[in-house]
Amino acid sequence: MAHVTGSASHREGAVAERGGGSPASSAVYPGDPRYEDLALRRRNERFVQRPACFRVVRSTDEVVAAVQWAVDSGRPVSVRSGGHSLENSVGEHPDGVIIDMTGMNAIHFDPDRRAVVLESGATLGEVYRTLYLTWGVTVPGGWCHSVCVGGHIQGGGYGSLSRTHGSVVDHLYAVEVVVVDEAGRARAVLATRESGDPHHDLWWAHTGGGGGNFGVVTRYWLRSPGAEGDDPADLLPRPPASLTGGVLMWSWADLPKESFRRLMRNHADWHENNSDPDSPGTALHSTLMLSGRKEQDSPADILIYALADGDGADGAALVEKYFDAVSDGVGGTRHMIPAAPWLYVLMPPNGDEESQRGSEYGRYKGKAGYLRKGFSTAQVDTVFDHLTTAPPMLDMARVWLVSYGGKVNDVAPEATALVQRDSVLKAAYTATWLDPRDDEASLDWLRRFYRDVYRETGGVPVPDGTNDGSYINYPDTDLADPDWNTSGVPWHDLYYKQNYPRLRRVKKRWDPRNVFRHALSIQPAD
């Protein structure tokens, strides 16, 4: 359970005492019985996170001290909050230090800055419960309740309310970051969205620049732009009182290739026509899940889950109209879900994030791409061909097409580091399996699948009329591998596009020694 407190603020620029002495945080080394517990708190069994030392922190001062100790000891620094990264950015340095942020999960209101404060170790589930039950507000974050805000917000953050309220970073007022200067001195800096703030560029870099780049984020302050007054209930979005939903399903046996093309075109057309910032259709969020075909077909091989804001008949009518459009000419089995309270739908009683500790997925690989419009017919055929011949060793092979756009697209691309501001869908490609002996074959299948979908643009979603790069919160080191990215477009342009040069300048200013680095980290400007 998150720790909810009253007002508090850490002094800006707090500095740890220099030297190699042990910091105040708990230091956990191999051989300590706590080490194995910390090492296993990752979400992907493909990766090993066995550093020289874990530092379990409980305050900004302890983070400053832990970073200073690592710098003075010459050890690489990694940061982990929820441990959901799709790549092994945290475990890249076996001789390094992993700073574990899960002990910093307080949520409170700061009256001086008129903003709600979230510590980095707070899970989305804790945030949703606390914000809503305390003040009746929320943030438009993701569905996985065990994700911590530490990484989620830095990469942009989106979820079922984003079409109505934008990305999470669109509500970010301030961020506290422990940085290391050129002299090797660790200190905490608070940066805000105020244009006159001398640290404004550091705030901007955390509105989509991705985790592990500039320092250790300890706290976020959230307040919606233009929000007035000092009542927390008026400073962040209010979720709908209730949600109405439904599912629409097909078996692979129901959808030969021509029907699959029709379904995908229907789905894309609806999103292309209903994703402007002021469209009434933004009150609806849906996920189309396309699962790899198994030996035994399932009634839910292809499934659309939709939710709509609005009480009673209005929400149900929007979902029904959406299902009518998507199922035109292809049928499908439809089940409507009665209206229920918002928090109950978001966090059903049997879905508590504490039950998700440890490895959630087995062995896992993910890829992603933004879509400005639907896939071409050739891309749709590629998706069909790969999913209907998915190898049996995969526990799950799936493409997710998630509603996007709406208010997300009401923000200029350069206003935040999150640059993709005219897409209507996010595509995610996932594969999970259990046996480590299947690693090579499983990875190869997903990599070839993704490459073939984007074969016209060098195997990756190069920004053009259809694609718009990828999402840094779904990191994929293959984008930096010339064997899988033959486009000539570097990985950082797929994630950050025209914002990358500015991010490099921020990196040079705030992490000139490149203390915080991993396979997809931003490089300091020359």
Residue ranges and their predicted role:
Residues 17-42:
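Conserved oxyanion/phosphate-binding beta-strand-loop segments in alpha/beta enzyme cores
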Residues 23-25, 50, 72-77, 94-96, ...:
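Loop/turn elements at helix/coil->beta-strand transitions in domains of secreted/extracellular proteins
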Residues 32, 43-105:
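Glycine-rich N-terminal segment of FAD-binding domains in flavoprotein oxidoreductases
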Residues 42-46, 61, 90-122, 160, ...:
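Glycine-/small-residue-rich beta-strand-loop submotif within the FAD-binding core of flavoenzymes
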Residues 56, 87-105, 161-181, 216-219, ...:
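Structural signature of FAD isoalloxazine-binding scaffolds in flavoprotein oxidoreductases
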Residues 107-112, 124-181, 188-189, 193:
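Hydrophobic, small-residue-rich alpha-helical packing segments that form membrane-like cores
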Residues 189-477, 484:
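C-terminal cap/substrate-recognition region of VAO/PCMH-type FAD-linked oxidoreductases
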Residues 437, 450-526:
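TerminUS-proximal long segments
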